[in-house]
Regions:
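Short, Lys/Arg-enriched N-terminal segments with co-localized hydrophobic residues
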Residues: 13-35
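N-terminal phosphate-binding or glycine-rich loops at protein starts, especially the Walker A/P-loop
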Residues: 37-75
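Glycine-rich phosphate/diphosphate-binding loop of Rossmann-like nucleotide-binding domains
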Residues: 42-56, 184-256
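Buried hydrophobic positions in well-ordered alpha/beta secondary-structure cores of metabolic enzymes
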Residues: 47-50, 104, 165, 207, ...
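A structured beta-alpha segment of the ubiquitous adenosine-cofactor-binding alpha/beta core
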Residues: 85-98, 251-270
């Protein structure tokens, strides 16, 4: 009952804030004296190191707000997690999606906890958010940053710098299928893949638009039409149709197995890569691995229309084995904050965070997972300090 009343009050306050600030224009990080813009952010630390990384990410975002008098963030703290599931039998309350609907964005840490199967957190929290709010784009940058060591030999930062666009709402992860004759030697299991023309076309078009927006020259499609004889040929057809409307952008296509190999052997060949839900999932983990560490990789679940809140989460898991030790790498979460700022219309502020993050890494201020000796707090404070210096205000 107390939670329900609190939820109603939170929603009311959020809506009041939106009415107050609706008429304000979005300013830029380089401009002082602009009118204030307030964003309401749902903060979901989740499990394990998520509590530490979200705290670090918020510290960096608050520093950006401190140096920019036209930007403010207010947080709605939500304890939804696998631990919440163990206590309540569900990953979030019944009205959880309505709570999130009132927010401008969702800042998520990591979910996962011993004793709770991964499919529980996926289907109980992440997928309902992605699908209810039409976050049909999962965007993950793959970039080798200065100071980070790649497992690939003789590769420099300019060799690994591309974007992976994953279809996030349908495809192979559709909840359709079933099992018959369970436990017998005649058991039958069927998992259906669902592609729609609308869904495939919009994600591919997003990839081409992204190439144009970021000044990249080519879009590469992940397929497997030599073995999957209905959905993948359809995907290829739509890719070709959409691609023809972007004559200045080169189209490439690889089967997923060959594409994975090429990520390793020729990462410099890619600008924007687009794939279905499953293939994109595979590539968006492989990409950060070749860039040095999943621990610094960000992820954005985006509704490009901005009708609904988008969700920003690092690629890394909850890492319960190091939770609470203060050694978690906060860079992935901080990078997520930069992507969130860009999505909310403060691209200059996102670039400021990325410059501070990059300079911090280049200076060797890193955690042990990428070869450093610093802890979570030290890395976070170093990024915040650089933001202040870059913005011309030393605290």
């Amino acid at each position: 009952m107390h939670f329900y009343i609190g939820t109603l009050l939170a929603i009311a306050l959020f809506k009041i804030n939106k009415l107050i600030y609706y008429h304000y224009e979005v300013s830029h990080c380089s401009g002082k004296g602009d009118k204030m813009k307030t964003f309401n952010i749902a903060s979901i630390p989740g499990d394990g190191i998520g509590k530490e990384t979200v705290s670090a990410g918020r510290q960096v975002l608050n520093t950006v707000c401190d140096v920019h008098d036209g930007l403010r963030m207010e947080y709605l703290d939500l304890d939804w997690s696998c631990e919440y599931y163990l206590k309540n039998g569900r990953m979030m309350p019944e009205d959880g999606l309505e709570v999130l609907r009132s927010c401008d964005a969702i800042f998520l840490g990591a979910v996962g906890f011993p004793g709770v199967p991964d499919h529980v957190s996926l289907w109980g929290l992440l997928l309902p958010i992605r699908r209810t709010f039409r976050q049909y784009i999962n965007l993950r940058p793959v970039k080798l940053l200065p100071g980070v060591i790649t497992p690939l030999a003789n590769r420099k930062p300019e060799d690994i710098d591309f974007l992976v666009v994953r279809e996030n709402n349908e495809g192979e992860y559709s909840n359709m299928g079933g099992r018959l004759y369970q436990g017998t030697d005649q058991e039958i299991v069927v998992q259906n893949t669902v592609f729609t023309r609308y869904g495939v076309e919009r994600v591919i078009r997003y990839a081409f638009d992204l190439a144009v927006k970021t000044g990249r020259q080519q879009v590469t499609s992940a397929t497997k039409s030599n073995g999957i004889n209905f959905t993948m040929p359809f995907w290829d057809e739509v890719f070709a149709e959409v691609g023809k409307t972007y004559p200045a952008i080169t189209r490439n296509q690889y089967h997923i197995d060959a594409l994975c190999a090429r990520f390793v052997t020729h990462p410099q060949d890619f600008d924007v890569v687009v794939g279905s839900n499953l293939f994109g999932d595979i590539l968006t983990d492989l990409g950060p691995a070749i860039a040095g560490s999943i621990g610094i990789a960000p992820s954005a679940n985006i509704d490009p229309t901005k009708e609904y809140p988008s969700m920003f989460e690092p690629v890394h898991g909850s890492a319960p084995d190091i939770a609470g030790k203060g050694i978690a790498n906060p860079m992935g979460q901080i990078w997520c904050g930069a992507m969130m700022l860009d999505h909310l219309g403060f691209a200059d502020c996102g670039e400021l965070v990325m410059q501070a993050l990059t300079e911090t890494l280049a200076a060797g201020m890193t955690t042990a997972d990428v070869g450093g000796r610093s802890n979570t707090r030290e890395v976070t404070e170093a990024v915040c300090s650089r933001i202040r210096m870059l913005a011309g205000t030393v605290a």
